[in-house]
Design a protein with these regions (language model features):
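Flexible, P/S/T/G-rich "lid" or insertion loops adjacent to the active sites of thioester-utilizing
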Residues: 158-168
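Non-catalytic N-terminal regions of enzymes
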Residues: 1-160
């Protein structure tokens, strides 16, 4: 990935949580009306990821900088309700989808996305799952994501004020 496409400044803000001894994960859990079929949930996850490449990333560290880069590994649905060690036990992904009984669990690092940012992705997964499992006809609207954070463009658009005698 080109240096200009990397969003190091944004990622730097969140890596303090990533490298803590006690990792902080967010979790949503969804109780469905029937037992979850892991194979269908895997198909739904794969389809959702193909429509939302932002989530198909891994954290890459180079010296003192960290970047999100494409993750070529498969993103798997895991069995059970226990939180997995992310990214060590998730093929490098910064989130995890698992299921047990009638419940789907979704764990993620907050610096990748917040609750508002994760909602369209989770909705897409659940709608795709319901379409596969029950033959529903959810439309699966596109997931909109912002372009990569570009500090140079922001600084050019909003330059720092020049110092004057009154501010010295």
């Amino acid at each position: 990935m080109e240096q200009a496409q990397r969003s190091a400044e944004y990622i730097f803000q969140g890596t303090m949580y990533f490298f803590r001894r006690e990792k902080i994960l967010c979790r949503y859990q969804f109780a469905l009306k029937d037992a979850v079929d892991p194979a269908l949930l895997q198909r739904a996850l794969d389809a959702a990821l193909s429509a939302a490449p932002y989530y198909r990333v891994q954290l890459v560290q180079e010296k003192r900088e960290a970047f999100l880069e494409p993750n070529p590994n498969p993103c798997l649905v895991y069995a059970g309700s226990a939180q997995r060690s992310i990214p060590e036990e998730t093929n490098g992904y910064l989130f995890s989808v698992s299921c047990e009984g009638d419940t789907v669990y979704f764990d993620w690092y907050h610096f990748l996305m917040d609750g508002r940012g994760v909602s369209p992705f989770l909705t897409r997964i659940l709608e795709l799952y319901c379409n596969l499992r029950y033959g529903t006809a959810f439309a699966n609207t596109p997931i909109v994501s912002s372009p990569a954070y570009d500090i140079e463009a922001m600084m050019a658009k909003y330059p720092a004020p020049e110092a004057s005698e009154s501010t010295l």
